[in-house]
């Protein structure tokens, strides 16, 4: 464990980079020394604003060198850094910003009372050693879940956990990460640095000696070609679309060496097809916001395995009674990682459900083979993964049932070429009422956001029942939309 707290390892990477380019943004190139300078000035600005250990700072930022530096500066002053994803529905954004937030930092038009990056950068750097104020047991960052339960849950990771992560420490990289790091010469960054995946691969790129390349328009394959990217994160739907585009009109992807598939499982045959069309570049990671990376399959691994968990990560497969099961037997995955969250911020009930005895209950189902490879086979949760975001069926059902036209609502998921999975709803009308599908979709969108809006809404007389007489959603078949 380093003598100085996080982000000492990241600052050391920037200092070692010196005049080497570490971020490209349009025509602008930022070196390690320049980015370190931005961190120092932004940390000074935050301290001048009275912010320090234990303070919550909401980062409402784009993807720029200053945004990356602001996140690191927040850690330098020992704050609780809260990345706010763009596009959050109003109610969810208000929920995040009311969770013990002392200040908002933005690079856009500031709301009343918000601090701007430009204002913070006006604070001069005193030239002395950059003081790091993080305390081991303080929460260093909150990474919010998708909000599919109605309000996003903030996974709380301490400074001690950030220090324990391997990302910025090459000597601690497991074999799959070493192989991936060797391909990160030009890592394409887009979307939001509030994304745990996007930010962590950015730090890994620094440690690997590569350059983060910002794509303001992340359409694939165009962005890969334009920026000569060697690596990028990709969701399952985007992977499928890229494979289809390459079959129809191949683009020059000769620079590409790694695509890190994130967010949801890839069907084995589709993964083989992707590797046939794109070459040996597809890495399939498995992890959760609560745990970080659990395992990663490299291009040489055989689908549908998600690879070997590193030695520093404990994975147990347990039966419904919590008893570990032997290799080859399916069960629920319980995971323990050095950098895992300690719980959900201000949510003791959900924390007790998921975090128990030092383990994280993933609520994913899988098994090991005799050689120790990990396989995923399903979920214990009633969730649908749309565009790599988990959306719980329950809140969608409750939103639909809030309509006076609806007596009962049931939601299921089904594979979808465009979004990985899609939400499909079945509704029983209230007596004498005729549901309006457009109004129901608007109701869900306003309450839970676009990702929860059903792709189809089917009116039924009653829900099918299982042998027990209870409603059985497994008997509901979504409409075939392949035609």
Predicted features, each with a name:
Residues 2, 21-50, 58, 64, ...:
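Conserved AMP-binding/adenylate-forming core of the ANL superfamily
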Residues 166-186, 192-231, 245:
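Conserved AMP-binding/adenylation subdomain of ANL enzymes
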């Amino acid at each position: 464990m380093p003598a100085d707290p996080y982000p000492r390892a990241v600052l050391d990477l920037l200092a070692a980079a010196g005049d080497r380019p570490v971020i490209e943004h349009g025509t602008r190139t930022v070196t390690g020394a320049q980015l370190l300078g931005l961190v120092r000035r932004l940390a000074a600005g935050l301290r001048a604003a009275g912010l320090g250990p234990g303070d919550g700072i909401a980062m409402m930022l784009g993807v720029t060198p200053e945004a990356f530096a602001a996140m690191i500066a927040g850690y330098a002053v020992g704050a609780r850094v809260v990345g706010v994803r763009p596009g959050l529905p109003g109610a969810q954004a208000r929920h995040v910003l009311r969770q013990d937030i002392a200040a908002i930092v933005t690079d856009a038009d500031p709301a009343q009372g918000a601090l701007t990056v430009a204002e913070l950068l006006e604070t001069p750097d005193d030239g002395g050693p950059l003081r790091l104020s993080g305390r081991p047991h303080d929460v260093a960052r909150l990474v919010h879940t998708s909000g599919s339960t109605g309000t996003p849950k903030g996974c709380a990771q301490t400074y001690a956990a950030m220090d324990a992560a391997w990302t910025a420490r090459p000597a601690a990289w497991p074999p799959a990460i070493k192989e991936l790091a060797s391909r990160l010469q030009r890592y394409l960054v887009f979307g939001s640095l509030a994304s745990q995946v996007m930010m962590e691969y950015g730090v890994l790129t620094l440690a690997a000696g590569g350059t983060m390349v910002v794509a303001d328009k992340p359409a694939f394959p165009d962005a890969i070609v334009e920026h000569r990217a060697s690596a990028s994160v990709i969701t399952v739907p985007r992977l499928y679309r890229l494979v289809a585009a390459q079959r129809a009109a191949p683009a020059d992807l000769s620079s590409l060496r790694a695509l890190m598939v994130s967010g949801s499982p890839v069907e084995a045959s589709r993964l083989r097809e992707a590797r046939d069309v794109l070459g040996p570049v597809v890495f399939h990671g498995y992890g959760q916001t609560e745990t970080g990376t659990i395992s990663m399959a490299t291009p040489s691994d055989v689908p549908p395995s998600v690879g070997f968990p590193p030695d520093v990560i404990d994975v147990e497969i347990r039966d419904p009674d919590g008893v570990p099961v032997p290799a080859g037997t399916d069960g629920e995955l319980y995971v323990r990682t050095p950098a895992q969250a300690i719980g959900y911020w201000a949510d003791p009930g959900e924390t007790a459900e998921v975090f128990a005895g030092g383990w994280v209950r993933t609520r994913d189902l899988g098994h090991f083979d005799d050689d120790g490879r990990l396989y995923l086979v399903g979920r214990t949760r009633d969730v649908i993964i749309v565009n790599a975001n988990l959306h719980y069926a329950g809140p969608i059902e409750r939103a639909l049932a809030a309509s006076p036209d609806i007596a009962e609502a049931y939601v299921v998921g089904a594979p979808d070429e465009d979004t990985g999975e899609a939400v499909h709803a079945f509704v029983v009308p209230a007596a004498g009422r005729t549901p309006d599908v457009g109004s129901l979709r608007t109701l869900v969108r306003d309450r839970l956001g676009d990702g929860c809006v059903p792709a189809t809404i089917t009116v039924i007389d009653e829900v099918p029942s299982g042998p027990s007489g209870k409603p059985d959603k497994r008997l509901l078949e979504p409409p075939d939309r392949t035609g």
